[in-house]
């Protein structure tokens, strides 16, 4: 990635974003916005939905499991934040408010394959557009490793516009840690959309702060 991105320029933009804005009474997140160009989102292969594990996550994500039977026990032992049983899933049917609340309450969800048809019917219409559909855990998967990975990951999506928006840190983290988080995301994007051809610009901002712009000409190594 160092051959594509000028890390010194990007680090200076991160530091500027951290300085910008008034102090708040809460710990602000640091957000990354990547604007791409010449990406045809009418082509299904360009509409991506990726999980990227951060080297320095700002805080552990909350992970819930839709579970029953042996999978419920495995999920509990893996340290999920909540278990949602089959009966609870069925009780959600038609209750859009409760489903929306659940989608906001947790960052990621997991489920065994046999629950996916039920989940698709009950929560799919609300979870799907939000990118919150559960990660399917096959019978041979290491549930604990999956949960630990999700607790450190962010979702990178391209759906209706060629823009990626993702939380990459908090204002209390070192700029160098935030830089490393951003670089792994840019690496994933570069594999699919070579940034020398497709990057329009990068914006970095705190939750309530003004964005700092890094234009492609500034941040790309030519």
UniProtKB/Swiss-Prot annotation:
CDD domains reported in the protein's UniProt record: Ribosomal_L1
Gene3D superfamilies per the UniProt record, alphabetical: 3.30.190.20, 3.40.50.790
GO CC, alphabetical: large ribosomal subunit
Keywords from the named record: Repressor, Ribonucleoprotein, Ribosomal protein, RNA-binding, rRNA-binding, Translation regulation, tRNA-binding
UniProt GO BP: regulation of translation; translation
Keyword Aminoacyl-tRNA synthetase: no
Annotated InterPro entries: Ribosomal_uL1, Ribosomal_uL1-like, Ribosomal_uL1/biogenesis, Ribosomal_uL1_3-a/b-sand, Ribosomal_uL1_arc, Ribosomal_uL1_CS
Entry's Gene Ontology molecular function annotations: rRNA binding; structural constituent of ribosome; tRNA binding
Role description: Binds directly to 23S rRNA. Probably involved in E site tRNA release. Protein L1 is also a translational repressor protein, it controls the translation of its operon by binding to its mRNA.
Family indicated by similarity: Belongs to the universal ribosomal protein uL1 family.
Description of how the protein assembles with itself and partners: Part of the 50S ribosomal subunit.
Full protein name: Large ribosomal subunit protein uL1
Species for this entry: Pyrobaculum islandicum (strain DSM 4184 / JCM 9189 / GEO3)
């Amino acid at each position: 990635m160092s051959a594509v991105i000028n890390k010194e320029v990007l680090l200076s933009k991160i530091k500027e974003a951290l300085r910008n804005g008034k102090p708040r009474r809460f710990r602000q997140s640091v957000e990354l916005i990547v604007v791409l160009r010449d990406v045809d989102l009418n082509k299904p292969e360009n509409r991506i939905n990726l999980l990227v594990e951060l080297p320095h996550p700002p805080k552990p994500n909350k992970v819930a499991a839709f579970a029953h039977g042996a999978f419920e026990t495995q999920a509990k032992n893996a340290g999920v934040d909540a278990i949602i049983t089959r009966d609870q899933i069925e009780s959600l049917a038609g209750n859009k408010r409760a489903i929306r609340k659940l989608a906001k309450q947790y960052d990621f969800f997991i489920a065994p394959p046999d629950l996916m048809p039920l989940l698709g019917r009950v929560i799919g219409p609300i979870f799907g557009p939000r990118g919150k559909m559960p990660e399917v855990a096959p019978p041979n998967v290491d549930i604990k490793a999956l949960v630990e990975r999700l607790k450190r990951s962010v979702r990178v999506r391209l759906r209706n516009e060629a823009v990626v928006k993702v939380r990459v840190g908090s204002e209390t983290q070192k700029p160098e840690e935030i830089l490393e988080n951003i670089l792994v995301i840019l690496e994933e994007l570069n594999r699919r959309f070579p940034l020398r051809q497709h990057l329009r610009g990068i914006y970095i901002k705190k939750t309530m702060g003004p964005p700092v712009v890094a234009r492609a000409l500034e941040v790309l190594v030519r």
